[in-house]
Amino acid sequence: MSTRPTVSPSELEQIDLASPVLHAEYELDEIFRHLRADEPVYWQQPRNEQPGFWVISRHADVNEVYKDKEHFTTEHGNALATLLTGGDSASGAMLAVTDGVRHHQVRNVLSRGFSARMLDLIAHTLQETVDGLLLAALERGECDAAQDIAADVPLGAICDLLEIPHADRKYLLGLTSHAWSTDYADEPPEESWVAKNEILLYFSKLLKERRGGVREDMVSLLANCRIDGDPLKAAEQMANCYGLMIGGDETGRHAITGTILALIQNPDQWRALKNGDVDLNTATEEALRWTVPSLHGGRKATGDVVINGRRINAGDVVSVWISSANRDETVFDAPDEFNLARTPNKHFTFAYGSHYCLGHYLGRMEVYAVLDGLRRLVGDLEQIGEERWIYSSILHGMSSLPIRITG
Protein backbone atom coordinates (compact mmCIF):
# COMPACT_ATOMS: atom_id res chain seq x y z
CA MET A 1 0.00 0.00 0.00
CA SER A 2 2.81 2.41 0.81
CA THR A 3 5.07 3.47 -2.03
CA ARG A 4 8.65 4.10 -1.06
CA PRO A 5 10.74 6.32 -3.38
CA THR A 6 13.15 4.46 -5.65
CA VAL A 7 16.84 5.35 -5.52
CA SER A 8 18.38 5.89 -8.97
CA PRO A 9 21.80 4.46 -9.89
CA SER A 10 22.90 8.06 -10.52
CA GLU A 11 22.67 8.55 -6.74
CA LEU A 12 24.94 5.60 -5.91
CA GLU A 13 27.90 7.74 -4.84
CA GLN A 14 25.75 9.76 -2.43
CA ILE A 15 23.93 6.96 -0.58
CA ASP A 16 25.25 4.77 2.23
CA LEU A 17 24.36 1.10 1.87
CA ALA A 18 25.10 0.60 5.57
CA SER A 19 22.36 3.06 6.56
CA PRO A 20 19.26 1.61 8.28
CA VAL A 21 17.26 4.65 7.12
CA LEU A 22 18.09 3.91 3.48
CA HIS A 23 16.76 0.35 3.70
CA ALA A 24 13.62 1.31 5.63
CA GLU A 25 12.52 4.32 3.59
CA TYR A 26 13.67 3.64 0.01
CA GLU A 27 13.44 0.99 -2.71
CA LEU A 28 16.90 -0.15 -3.85
CA ASP A 29 16.01 -2.58 -6.66
CA GLU A 30 17.38 -0.26 -9.37
CA ILE A 31 20.61 0.25 -7.43
CA PHE A 32 21.27 -3.47 -7.16
CA ARG A 33 20.18 -4.12 -10.74
CA HIS A 34 22.80 -1.58 -11.82
CA LEU A 35 25.46 -3.08 -9.55
CA ARG A 36 24.86 -6.62 -10.83
CA ALA A 37 25.09 -5.44 -14.44
CA ASP A 38 27.92 -2.89 -14.28
CA GLU A 39 29.71 -2.88 -10.91
CA PRO A 40 29.29 -6.33 -9.37
CA VAL A 41 32.22 -5.83 -6.99
CA TYR A 42 31.74 -2.22 -5.91
CA TRP A 43 33.78 -0.22 -3.40
CA GLN A 44 31.69 2.16 -1.33
CA GLN A 45 33.93 5.04 -0.34
CA PRO A 46 34.20 6.05 3.33
CA ARG A 47 31.29 8.19 4.56
CA ASN A 48 32.33 10.76 7.19
CA GLU A 49 34.08 8.65 9.84
CA GLN A 50 32.67 5.35 8.56
CA PRO A 51 35.20 3.13 6.71
CA GLY A 52 34.67 2.05 3.13
CA PHE A 53 33.59 -1.48 2.23
CA TRP A 54 33.05 -3.81 -0.72
CA VAL A 55 29.56 -4.54 -2.03
CA ILE A 56 29.19 -7.96 -3.72
CA SER A 57 25.91 -8.20 -5.63
CA ARG A 58 26.02 -11.11 -8.12
CA HIS A 59 24.92 -14.62 -7.16
CA ALA A 60 28.12 -16.27 -8.40
CA ASP A 61 30.37 -13.83 -6.52
CA VAL A 62 28.34 -14.12 -3.32
CA ASN A 63 28.69 -17.88 -3.62
CA GLU A 64 32.47 -17.54 -4.07
CA VAL A 65 32.88 -15.41 -0.95
CA TYR A 66 30.69 -17.69 1.15
CA LYS A 67 32.77 -20.73 0.15
CA ASP A 68 36.20 -19.12 0.58
CA LYS A 69 37.28 -19.80 4.16
CA GLU A 70 40.92 -19.16 3.24
CA HIS A 71 40.51 -15.45 2.42
CA PHE A 72 37.43 -14.39 4.41
CA THR A 73 36.50 -14.55 8.08
CA THR A 74 33.51 -13.73 10.27
CA GLU A 75 35.61 -13.33 13.40
CA HIS A 76 35.49 -9.53 13.25
CA GLY A 77 31.73 -9.56 12.65
CA ASN A 78 29.23 -10.91 10.13
CA ALA A 79 27.31 -7.68 9.41
CA LEU A 80 28.23 -4.13 8.46
CA ALA A 81 26.82 -2.81 11.73
CA THR A 82 29.66 -4.48 13.65
CA LEU A 83 32.38 -4.69 11.00
CA LEU A 84 32.38 -0.91 10.48
CA THR A 85 32.36 -0.08 14.19
CA GLY A 86 35.28 -2.02 15.60
CA GLY A 87 34.11 -5.62 15.44
CA ASP A 88 31.71 -7.96 17.23
CA SER A 89 32.09 -8.39 20.98
CA ALA A 90 30.92 -12.02 20.62
CA SER A 91 33.77 -12.87 18.24
CA GLY A 92 35.18 -16.29 18.99
CA ALA A 93 32.25 -17.09 21.29
CA MET A 94 29.06 -17.07 19.17
CA LEU A 95 28.96 -19.60 16.34
CA ALA A 96 28.07 -16.99 13.70
CA VAL A 97 31.28 -15.04 14.40
CA THR A 98 33.62 -17.97 15.02
CA ASP A 99 35.69 -19.77 12.39
CA GLY A 100 38.12 -22.66 12.17
CA VAL A 101 38.29 -25.64 14.49
CA ARG A 102 36.24 -24.01 17.26
CA HIS A 103 33.43 -23.25 14.80
CA HIS A 104 33.32 -26.90 13.77
CA GLN A 105 33.31 -28.09 17.39
CA VAL A 106 30.55 -25.74 18.58
CA ARG A 107 28.46 -26.34 15.45
CA ASN A 108 28.56 -30.08 16.14
CA VAL A 109 27.28 -29.44 19.68
CA LEU A 110 24.44 -27.20 18.52
CA SER A 111 23.48 -29.62 15.73
CA ARG A 112 22.59 -32.19 18.39
CA GLY A 113 19.89 -29.83 19.64
CA PHE A 114 18.19 -29.93 16.23
CA SER A 115 17.51 -33.66 16.51
CA ALA A 116 14.79 -35.29 14.42
CA ARG A 117 12.83 -36.07 17.59
CA MET A 118 12.93 -32.46 18.79
CA LEU A 119 12.02 -31.07 15.37
CA ASP A 120 9.09 -33.51 15.07
CA LEU A 121 7.75 -32.30 18.42
CA ILE A 122 8.12 -28.67 17.37
CA ALA A 123 6.47 -29.31 13.99
CA HIS A 124 3.33 -30.65 15.68
CA THR A 125 3.11 -27.73 18.09
CA LEU A 126 3.98 -25.27 15.31
CA GLN A 127 0.96 -26.11 13.14
CA GLU A 128 -1.32 -25.92 16.17
CA THR A 129 0.12 -22.48 16.97
CA VAL A 130 -0.33 -21.20 13.41
CA ASP A 131 -3.89 -22.50 13.15
CA GLY A 132 -4.79 -20.97 16.49
CA LEU A 133 -3.39 -17.56 15.51
CA LEU A 134 -5.20 -17.60 12.15
CA LEU A 135 -8.51 -18.65 13.72
CA ALA A 136 -8.20 -15.89 16.32
CA ALA A 137 -7.49 -13.37 13.56
CA LEU A 138 -10.47 -14.64 11.55
CA GLU A 139 -12.72 -14.19 14.56
CA ARG A 140 -11.62 -10.56 14.92
CA GLY A 141 -11.76 -9.92 11.17
CA GLU A 142 -8.91 -7.42 11.27
CA CYS A 143 -5.43 -7.72 12.74
CA ASP A 144 -1.81 -6.70 12.39
CA ALA A 145 -0.16 -9.58 10.53
CA ALA A 146 3.28 -8.66 11.84
CA GLN A 147 2.28 -8.45 15.48
CA ASP A 148 -0.70 -10.80 15.78
CA ILE A 149 0.42 -13.66 13.51
CA ALA A 150 4.07 -13.53 12.46
CA ALA A 151 5.50 -12.54 15.85
CA ASP A 152 4.24 -15.61 17.70
CA VAL A 153 5.09 -18.32 15.17
CA PRO A 154 8.92 -18.32 15.25
CA LEU A 155 8.92 -17.12 18.85
CA GLY A 156 7.03 -20.24 19.90
CA ALA A 157 9.26 -22.55 17.85
CA ILE A 158 12.62 -21.24 19.06
CA CYS A 159 11.36 -20.96 22.64
CA ASP A 160 10.22 -24.60 22.47
CA LEU A 161 13.70 -25.56 21.27
CA LEU A 162 15.28 -23.65 24.16
CA GLU A 163 12.47 -24.60 26.59
CA ILE A 164 11.88 -20.99 27.58
CA PRO A 165 9.11 -20.71 30.22
CA HIS A 166 5.88 -19.45 28.64
CA ALA A 167 5.69 -16.57 31.10
CA ASP A 168 9.00 -15.17 29.75
CA ARG A 169 8.29 -15.38 26.02
CA LYS A 170 6.60 -12.02 25.41
CA TYR A 171 9.37 -10.33 27.39
CA LEU A 172 12.00 -11.90 25.13
CA LEU A 173 10.03 -10.97 22.00
CA GLY A 174 10.15 -7.33 23.06
CA LEU A 175 13.92 -7.57 23.46
CA THR A 176 14.71 -9.45 20.24
CA SER A 177 12.65 -7.04 18.14
CA HIS A 178 14.93 -4.18 19.21
CA ALA A 179 18.32 -5.92 19.33
CA TRP A 180 19.15 -5.51 15.63
CA SER A 181 16.45 -3.16 14.36
CA THR A 182 14.26 -0.26 15.45
CA ASP A 183 10.75 0.84 14.58
CA TYR A 184 11.68 4.49 14.10
CA ALA A 185 14.55 6.40 12.48
CA ASP A 186 15.29 8.45 15.59
CA GLU A 187 15.18 5.63 18.13
CA PRO A 188 18.25 5.98 20.40
CA PRO A 189 21.01 3.41 19.69
CA GLU A 190 21.15 2.74 23.42
CA GLU A 191 17.82 0.88 23.05
CA SER A 192 19.56 -1.79 20.97
CA TRP A 193 22.49 -2.05 23.38
CA VAL A 194 20.17 -2.44 26.37
CA ALA A 195 18.07 -5.09 24.57
CA LYS A 196 21.13 -7.18 23.65
CA ASN A 197 22.50 -7.05 27.19
CA GLU A 198 19.16 -7.94 28.77
CA ILE A 199 18.94 -11.01 26.51
CA LEU A 200 22.44 -12.07 27.58
CA LEU A 201 21.60 -11.50 31.25
CA TYR A 202 18.41 -13.55 30.91
CA PHE A 203 20.30 -16.50 29.43
CA SER A 204 23.08 -16.20 31.99
CA LYS A 205 20.49 -16.86 34.70
CA LEU A 206 18.76 -19.65 32.75
CA LEU A 207 22.05 -21.41 32.02
CA LYS A 208 22.93 -21.32 35.71
CA GLU A 209 19.59 -22.94 36.57
CA ARG A 210 20.08 -25.75 34.04
CA ARG A 211 23.71 -26.53 34.75
CA GLY A 212 23.99 -30.08 36.05
CA GLY A 213 20.44 -30.98 35.03
CA VAL A 214 19.21 -33.78 32.78
CA ARG A 215 16.85 -31.85 30.47
CA GLU A 216 17.29 -32.21 26.70
CA ASP A 217 16.62 -28.65 25.54
CA MET A 218 19.21 -26.51 23.73
CA VAL A 219 20.00 -24.35 26.80
CA SER A 220 20.72 -27.46 28.87
CA LEU A 221 22.83 -28.86 26.05
CA LEU A 222 25.01 -25.73 26.02
CA ALA A 223 25.17 -25.59 29.82
CA ASN A 224 26.33 -29.18 30.23
CA CYS A 225 28.20 -30.22 27.07
CA ARG A 226 31.94 -30.79 26.94
CA ILE A 227 34.41 -30.42 24.10
CA ASP A 228 37.64 -32.39 24.53
CA GLY A 229 36.65 -32.87 28.17
CA ASP A 230 36.15 -29.18 28.92
CA PRO A 231 32.83 -27.32 29.31
CA LEU A 232 32.02 -24.41 27.04
CA LYS A 233 33.12 -21.07 28.47
CA ALA A 234 30.32 -19.05 30.05
CA ALA A 235 30.69 -16.44 27.29
CA GLU A 236 30.20 -19.14 24.63
CA GLN A 237 27.11 -20.49 26.37
CA MET A 238 25.47 -17.06 26.66
CA ALA A 239 26.47 -15.90 23.18
CA ASN A 240 25.09 -18.99 21.49
CA CYS A 241 21.80 -18.84 23.38
CA TYR A 242 21.59 -15.22 22.24
CA GLY A 243 22.44 -16.17 18.64
CA LEU A 244 19.81 -18.91 18.55
CA MET A 245 17.17 -16.60 20.01
CA ILE A 246 17.85 -13.71 17.62
CA GLY A 247 18.30 -15.90 14.54
CA GLY A 248 15.32 -18.10 15.33
CA ASP A 249 12.91 -15.29 16.12
CA GLU A 250 13.79 -12.25 14.00
CA THR A 251 14.34 -13.85 10.59
CA GLY A 252 11.31 -16.14 10.80
CA ARG A 253 9.05 -13.29 11.86
CA HIS A 254 10.09 -11.10 8.94
CA ALA A 255 9.83 -13.95 6.42
CA ILE A 256 6.26 -14.69 7.51
CA THR A 257 5.11 -11.05 7.44
CA GLY A 258 6.75 -10.57 4.04
CA THR A 259 5.05 -13.69 2.70
CA ILE A 260 1.61 -12.45 3.75
CA LEU A 261 2.26 -9.08 2.06
CA ALA A 262 3.48 -10.83 -1.11
CA LEU A 263 0.31 -12.94 -1.27
CA ILE A 264 -1.84 -9.81 -0.91
CA GLN A 265 0.11 -8.00 -3.63
CA ASN A 266 0.05 -10.99 -5.99
CA PRO A 267 -3.56 -12.27 -6.13
CA ASP A 268 -2.71 -14.81 -8.83
CA GLN A 269 -0.28 -16.48 -6.42
CA TRP A 270 -2.85 -16.35 -3.62
CA ARG A 271 -5.29 -18.17 -5.91
CA ALA A 272 -2.62 -20.72 -6.86
CA LEU A 273 -1.97 -21.39 -3.17
CA LYS A 274 -5.68 -21.63 -2.32
CA ASN A 275 -6.46 -23.90 -5.27
CA GLY A 276 -3.66 -26.31 -4.40
CA ASP A 277 -1.88 -25.58 -7.68
CA VAL A 278 1.54 -25.28 -6.03
CA ASP A 279 3.52 -27.67 -3.87
CA LEU A 280 3.94 -26.23 -0.37
CA ASN A 281 7.63 -27.10 -0.17
CA THR A 282 8.26 -25.30 -3.47
CA ALA A 283 6.14 -22.36 -2.33
CA THR A 284 8.12 -22.17 0.90
CA GLU A 285 11.39 -21.76 -1.00
CA GLU A 286 9.97 -18.92 -3.09
CA ALA A 287 8.65 -17.18 0.02
CA LEU A 288 12.14 -17.37 1.52
CA ARG A 289 13.81 -16.11 -1.67
CA TRP A 290 11.38 -13.24 -2.02
CA THR A 291 11.23 -11.93 1.52
CA VAL A 292 15.01 -11.87 2.24
CA PRO A 293 14.80 -11.50 6.04
CA SER A 294 18.58 -10.96 6.14
CA LEU A 295 19.75 -8.35 3.64
CA HIS A 296 23.46 -9.10 3.65
CA GLY A 297 26.28 -11.05 5.22
CA GLY A 298 29.60 -9.56 6.25
CA ARG A 299 33.19 -10.75 6.15
CA LYS A 300 36.69 -9.33 6.56
CA ALA A 301 39.39 -10.31 4.07
CA THR A 302 42.27 -12.16 5.74
CA GLY A 303 44.46 -12.00 2.65
CA ASP A 304 44.61 -10.36 -0.75
CA VAL A 305 42.15 -11.98 -3.14
CA VAL A 306 40.57 -11.26 -6.53
CA ILE A 307 36.79 -11.48 -6.93
CA ASN A 308 35.39 -11.02 -10.44
CA GLY A 309 38.48 -9.09 -11.54
CA ARG A 310 38.62 -6.72 -8.55
CA ARG A 311 41.44 -6.94 -6.04
CA ILE A 312 40.30 -7.05 -2.42
CA ASN A 313 43.07 -6.32 0.08
CA ALA A 314 43.69 -8.02 3.39
CA GLY A 315 41.76 -6.18 6.10
CA ASP A 316 39.02 -4.91 3.78
CA VAL A 317 35.40 -5.22 4.90
CA VAL A 318 33.26 -7.19 2.43
CA SER A 319 29.46 -7.32 2.29
CA VAL A 320 27.62 -9.97 0.27
CA TRP A 321 24.09 -8.87 -0.59
CA ILE A 322 21.57 -11.69 -0.33
CA SER A 323 18.82 -9.27 -1.36
CA SER A 324 20.62 -8.77 -4.69
CA ALA A 325 21.82 -12.33 -5.28
CA ASN A 326 18.26 -13.61 -4.77
CA ARG A 327 17.18 -11.42 -7.72
CA ASP A 328 20.08 -12.24 -10.05
CA GLU A 329 18.76 -12.43 -13.62
CA THR A 330 21.44 -14.95 -14.62
CA VAL A 331 20.18 -17.45 -12.03
CA PHE A 332 16.43 -16.83 -11.71
CA ASP A 333 13.92 -16.49 -14.55
CA ALA A 334 11.86 -13.32 -14.09
CA PRO A 335 13.45 -12.73 -10.67
CA ASP A 336 11.22 -9.75 -9.88
CA GLU A 337 8.10 -11.93 -10.07
CA PHE A 338 6.76 -13.72 -6.99
CA ASN A 339 6.20 -17.24 -8.32
CA LEU A 340 5.27 -19.95 -5.81
CA ALA A 341 5.92 -22.66 -8.41
CA ARG A 342 9.52 -21.51 -9.04
CA THR A 343 12.00 -24.34 -9.37
CA PRO A 344 14.93 -24.65 -9.06
CA ASN A 345 15.34 -21.98 -6.41
CA LYS A 346 18.97 -21.51 -5.40
CA HIS A 347 18.45 -18.62 -3.01
CA PHE A 348 20.91 -17.52 -0.33
CA THR A 349 18.35 -16.71 2.36
CA PHE A 350 20.08 -19.13 4.75
CA ALA A 351 23.56 -18.12 3.54
CA TYR A 352 25.93 -20.83 2.27
CA GLY A 353 29.14 -22.65 3.11
CA SER A 354 30.42 -23.28 6.62
CA HIS A 355 28.06 -20.65 8.06
CA TYR A 356 24.93 -22.07 6.42
CA CYS A 357 22.11 -21.33 8.85
CA LEU A 358 21.93 -24.02 11.51
CA GLY A 359 18.20 -23.43 11.93
CA HIS A 360 17.31 -23.60 8.24
CA TYR A 361 15.01 -26.59 8.73
CA LEU A 362 13.15 -24.81 11.52
CA GLY A 363 12.81 -21.66 9.38
CA ARG A 364 11.37 -23.68 6.52
CA MET A 365 8.94 -25.42 8.88
CA GLU A 366 7.62 -22.07 10.09
CA VAL A 367 6.94 -20.64 6.62
CA TYR A 368 5.47 -23.97 5.46
CA ALA A 369 3.10 -24.06 8.45
CA VAL A 370 1.86 -20.54 7.71
CA LEU A 371 1.29 -21.29 4.01
CA ASP A 372 -0.52 -24.50 4.94
CA GLY A 373 -2.70 -22.72 7.48
CA LEU A 374 -3.55 -19.89 5.08
CA ARG A 375 -4.52 -22.37 2.37
CA ARG A 376 -6.81 -24.40 4.64
CA LEU A 377 -8.38 -21.74 6.83
CA VAL A 378 -8.37 -18.35 5.12
CA GLY A 379 -10.62 -17.23 2.28
CA ASP A 380 -9.17 -13.80 1.56
CA LEU A 381 -6.55 -11.31 2.72
CA GLU A 382 -6.65 -7.53 2.26
CA GLN A 383 -4.23 -4.83 3.36
CA ILE A 384 -6.10 -2.06 5.20
CA GLY A 385 -3.28 0.23 6.32
CA GLU A 386 0.27 1.15 5.44
CA GLU A 387 2.96 -1.34 6.33
CA ARG A 388 5.81 -0.04 8.51
CA TRP A 389 9.32 -1.17 7.59
CA ILE A 390 11.94 -1.68 10.29
CA TYR A 391 15.13 0.38 10.45
CA SER A 392 18.06 -1.98 10.00
CA SER A 393 20.91 -2.53 7.55
CA ILE A 394 20.96 -6.28 8.21
CA LEU A 395 17.33 -7.32 8.79
CA HIS A 396 14.54 -6.78 6.26
CA GLY A 397 10.95 -6.80 7.38
CA MET A 398 7.98 -4.99 8.83
CA SER A 399 6.98 -4.09 12.36
CA SER A 400 3.37 -3.55 11.26
CA LEU A 401 1.10 -4.87 8.49
CA PRO A 402 -2.62 -4.13 9.08
CA ILE A 403 -4.86 -6.62 7.26
CA ARG A 404 -8.47 -7.75 6.94
CA ILE A 405 -8.76 -11.53 7.03
CA THR A 406 -11.88 -13.54 6.12
CA GLY A 407 -12.77 -17.21 6.04
Swiss-Prot record:
Its EC number is 1.14.-.-. Heme binds at residue 357. SUPFAM superfamilies: Cytochrome P450 (SSF48264). It comes from the Bacteria. GO terms for molecular function: cholest-4-en-3-one 26-monooxygenase activity; heme binding; iron ion binding; monooxygenase activity; steroid hydroxylase activity. Pathway: Antibiotic biosynthesis; novobiocin biosynthesis. InterPro entries: Cyt_P450, Cyt_P450_B, Cyt_P450_sf. Pfam families: p450. Its cofactor is heme. PANTHER family: BIOTIN BIOSYNTHESIS CYTOCHROME P450, P450, PUTATIVE (EUROFUNG)-RELATED. Together with NovH, involved in the formation of a beta-OH-Tyr intermediate in the novobiocin biosynthesis pathway, an aminocoumarin family antibiotic that targets bacterial DNA gyrases. Acts as a cytochrome P450-type monooxygenase with specificity for the tyrosyl-S-NovH acyl enzyme (L-Tyr-S-NovH) to form the beta-OH-Tyr intermediate (L-beta-OH-Tyr-S-NovH). Belongs to the cytochrome P450 family. This is Cytochrome P450 NovI. It comes from Streptomyces niveus. The gene is novI.
